[in-house]
């Protein structure tokens, strides 16, 4: 068992942080639009994969594979990232702030399923309530079983 702070831990953490840069780069081009669409209560453009990522193995397109989260450890690192973590929380809260609409009005199929998968993943990566609140509100408090199986 490796101890905290060993050189191999440091390399792993650094490699994961560098790999997360793919999300930062993708979001940089669209984050203002993402916020506007979520505030309006309807996703209109293509950004789901890198704003609300899912666990590896759920998506089969090249884009889905590129932005898949490989493990619970990577999900935890995503949440701890100084840009990605706050953005994910903010975007999730914007979805939660939408009132009077079912999730299928906010995210058309299959993005409604991707959102559920993402919320399930991050609810397992942290005790923060915001992610669980999302699937409680929109999915009757039922997690995405495909995500849970892969964790």
Protein language model features and the residues they cover:
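Mid-chain, well-packed structural core segment of small domains
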Residues: 77-122
């Amino acid at each position: 068992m490796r101890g905290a702070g060993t050189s191999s831990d440091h390399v792993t953490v650094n490699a994961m942080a560098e790999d997360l840069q793919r999300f930062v780069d993708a979001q940089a081009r669209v984050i203002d639009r993402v916020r506007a669409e979520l505030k309006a209560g309807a996703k209109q453009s293509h950004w789901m994969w890198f704003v609300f990522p899912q666990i590896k193995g759920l998506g089969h397109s090249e884009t889905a594979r590129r932005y898949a989260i490989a493990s619970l450890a990577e999900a935890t690192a995503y949440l701890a990232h100084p840009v990605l973590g706050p953005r994910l929380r903010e975007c999730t809260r914007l979805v939660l702030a939408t009132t009077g609409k079912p999730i299928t009005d906010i995210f058309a199929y299959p993005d409604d399923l991707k959102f559920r998968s993402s919320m399930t993943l991050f609810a397992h990566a942290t005790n923060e309530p915001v992610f669980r609140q999302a699937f409680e509100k929109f999915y009757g408090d039922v997690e995405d079983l495909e995500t849970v199986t892969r964790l």
